[in-house]
């Protein structure tokens, strides 16, 4: 990843120059379009409820709530002490102690339990968000487990004569996520004579519950066509929900089950998972001393990164303010939320370029989306699209004033990200990025025309355009290119357009976003959605029928996406694809139950507080 120095503050490599910042700071007193032979000056009221102009331009309104995280509040955050060298030194000592105590596999040579203990240790360090310190040890542990894997799975230890659900389910999930070739057919061993998953009568046996919990977790990394994984998910979901009714609601096991059912895998964010897992970790561990060291290390690492987040967040807020964004009252302002999401999928200290880049790209996309979908007129948008594709600020003089601010923000930010990416990749990627943006502008323009004319496309026509207008590609491309992972053309084409990975992420984002937003969009005059277009193509279907079909499409696409990420013997390493995949988890997280991007709900605010604003108590 491109390394950006954040000491003592974020590197100027991600900041606009002073003359660029001045160019971006614009007020919006007028709205005008230059036309041959006609000079038009519009006076606008930028409150979201009405816009007055001399020719009475009527604009649609998003009715979005304002920015929840004022720049004054962000800049006033008091720095925590965790950036001091002594905290880093303590964390480094603990890393060594954990390796000596917990990853000393000579202490795990009990043939009756050695496989499960290795899997549990790997699972713990991953869920606590500290696995990057133990890559070598994790590989050694998983190689050992894999050497005893067979067509019936594994038992708790290498000498076990009976396969074990907990060990096999956890092993299937963990080995698959690390690129080992393991078949889900091993789960058939745990079916009864009727071919069904079954359990004992006493659902309160904690060991059995944990086995089913890991069966549920394993079912989420299913590949296409794996019927047994579908059956495992159905059985385990029902079982765990029933278990929650029978075990104490305040118990650690209950909290763990609720978290796993709530977030799953595709909607989970690693840093949020780490923060939540700290609250339940260690309660069922026999080696309390070792568990305490592991938990202390996790908390220290969480807070050391938190001290870096404070500086990055202040940079993001300054960038947002200096870019003229506060004057863009027609759009949503979710830059702080986007930074929290970026931090939750990339919390290695050296990935600053990715975090800042994703935050800025997401903000640009949000501004553009609201401008094209809601605020701009078709004439204005056609002019903006043609002008920005020229990539020449001197060509923007005929744009309305509010569009000039948007133009300059996009122009400077994309150029700056290209310079950061060039340092990481050793080549100029600006033209590549511009191609992604131009395709996005065209897709936005197409949707604006549909809105203006009331045209309802076919489902196929809508989805082809919607994959591009989902804007995953420009959001992900430049941040990924800042990574310290080389992306030569042949690798980049397997991660970005026209790869299957990119296509699936865009499909899922478009369809999932539609299922959460189509009613609000329709209320604003946007008729086209995957739901309405599918109903048009299939007369007689109800809205519920269409929603069910779209949800099945999403489910199938997720399975295909799992395969694209994890397929064995792949020429493209998982590490090269993982950040694009994790960005898809960001979108999933925000659309879990509702549109969490347009309207920041309690969960969104809690995410920002728990993963960015507040350190974890030591």
UniProtKB/Swiss-Prot annotation:
Any Pfam family matching the protein: Terpene_synth_C
Molecular function in Gene Ontology: camphene synthase activity; magnesium ion binding; terpene synthase activity
Keyword tRNA processing assigned: no
CC cofactor: Mg(2+); Mn(2+); K(+)
EC numbers for this chain: 4.2.3.117
Gene3D superfamilies (UniProt xref): Farnesyl Diphosphate Synthase, Terpene synthase, N-terminal domain
Binding residue positions for Mg(2+) 1: 369, 373
Sorted UniProt keywords: Chloroplast, Lyase, Magnesium, Manganese, Metal-binding, Plastid, Transit peptide
Reactions mediated catalytically: (2E)-geranyl diphosphate = (1S,4R)-camphene + diphosphate
Pathway assigned in UniProt: Terpene metabolism; oleoresin biosynthesis
Binding positions (Mg(2+) 3): 521
Residue interval of the organelle targeting sequence: 1-51
Sequence similarity: Belongs to the terpene synthase family. Tpsd subfamily.
Domain note: The Asp-Asp-Xaa-Xaa-Asp/Glu (DDXXD/E) motif is important for the catalytic activity, presumably through binding to Mg(2+).
PANTHER family assigned: OS04G0344100 PROTEIN-RELATED, TERPENE SYNTHASE 11-RELATED
Entry protein name: Camphene synthase, chloroplastic
Originating species: Abies grandis
Classification lineage: Eukaryota, Viridiplantae, Streptophyta, Embryophyta, Tracheophyta
């Amino acid at each position: 990843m491109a390394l950006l120095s954040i000491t003592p503050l974020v590197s100027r490599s991600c900041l606009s120059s002073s003359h660029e910042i001045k160019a971006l700071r614009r007020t919006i007193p007028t709205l005008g379009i230059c036309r041959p032979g006609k000079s038009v000056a519009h006076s606008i009221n930028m409150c979201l409820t009405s816009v007055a102009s001399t020719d009475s331009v009527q604009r649609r309104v998003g009715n979005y709530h304002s920015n929840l995280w004022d720049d004054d509040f962000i800049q006033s955050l008091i720095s925590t002490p965790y950036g001091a060298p002594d905290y880093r030194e303590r964390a480094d000592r603990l890393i060594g102690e954990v390796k000596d105590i917990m990853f000393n596999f000579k202490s795990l040579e009990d043939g009756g339990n050695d496989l499960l203990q290795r899997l549990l240790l790997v699972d713990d360090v991953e869920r606590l968000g500290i696995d990057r310190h133990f890559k070598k040890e994790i590989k050694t542990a998983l190689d050992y487990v894999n050497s005893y894997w067979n067509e019936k799975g594994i038992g708790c230890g290498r000498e076990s004569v009976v396969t074990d659900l907990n060990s096999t389910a956890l092993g299937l999930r963990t080995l698959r996520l690390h690129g080992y070739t393991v078949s889900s057919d091993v789960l058939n061993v745990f079916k009864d004579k009727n071919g069904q998953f079954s359990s004992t009568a006493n659902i309160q046996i904690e060991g059995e519950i944990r086995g089913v919990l890991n069966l549920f977790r394993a079912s989420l990394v299913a590949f296409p066509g794996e019927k047994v994984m579908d059956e495992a998910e159905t059985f385990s979901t029902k079982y765990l929900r029933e278990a929650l009714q029978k075990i104490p609601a305040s118990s650690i096991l209950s909290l763990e089950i609720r978290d796993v059912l709530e977030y799953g895998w595709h909607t989970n964010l690693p840093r949020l998972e780490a923060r939540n897992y700290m609250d339940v970790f260690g309660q069922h561990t026999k080696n309390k001393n070792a568990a305490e060291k592991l938990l202390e290390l996790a908390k220290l690492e969480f807070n050391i990164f938190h001290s870096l987040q404070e500086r990055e967040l202040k940079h993001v807020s300054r960038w947002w303010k200096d870019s003229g964004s506060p004057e863009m009252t027609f759009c949503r302002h979710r830059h702080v939320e986007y930074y929290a999401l970026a931090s939750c999928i990339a919390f290695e200290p050296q990935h600053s370029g990715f975090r800042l880049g994703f935050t800025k790209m997401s903000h640009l996309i949000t501004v553009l989306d609201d401008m094209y979908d809601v605020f701009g007129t078709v004439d204005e948008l056609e002019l903006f699209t043609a002008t920005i594709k020229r990539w020449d600020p001197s060509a923007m003089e005929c744009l309305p004033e509010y569009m000039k601010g948007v133009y300059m923000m996009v122009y400077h930010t994309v150029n700056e990200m290209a310079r950061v990416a060039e340092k990481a990749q050793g080549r100029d990627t600006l033209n590549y990025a511009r191609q992604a943006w131009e395709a996005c502008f065209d897709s936005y323009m197409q949707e604006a025309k549909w809105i203006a004319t009331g045209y309802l496309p076919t489902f196929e026509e809508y989805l082809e355009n919607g994959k591009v207008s989902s804007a995953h590609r420009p959001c992900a491309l430049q941040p990924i290119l800042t990574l310290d992972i080389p992306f030569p053309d042949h690798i980049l084409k397997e991660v970005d357009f026209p790869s299957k990975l990119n296509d699936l992420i865009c499909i899922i984002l478009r369809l999932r976003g539609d299922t959460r937003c189509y009613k609000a969009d329709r209320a604003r005059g946007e008729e086209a959605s995957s739901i309405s277009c599918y109903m048009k193509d299939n007369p007689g279907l109800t809205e519920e029928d269409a929603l069910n079909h779209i949800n099945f499409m999403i489910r199938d696409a997720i399975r295909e996406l799992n395969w694209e990420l994890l397929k064995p013997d792949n020429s493209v390493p998982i590490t090269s694809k993982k950040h694009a995949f994790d960005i898809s988890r960001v979108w999933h997280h925000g659309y879990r139950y509702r549109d969490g991007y347009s309207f920041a709900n309690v969960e969104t605010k809690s995410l920002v507080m728990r993963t960015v604003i507040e350190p974890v108590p030591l």
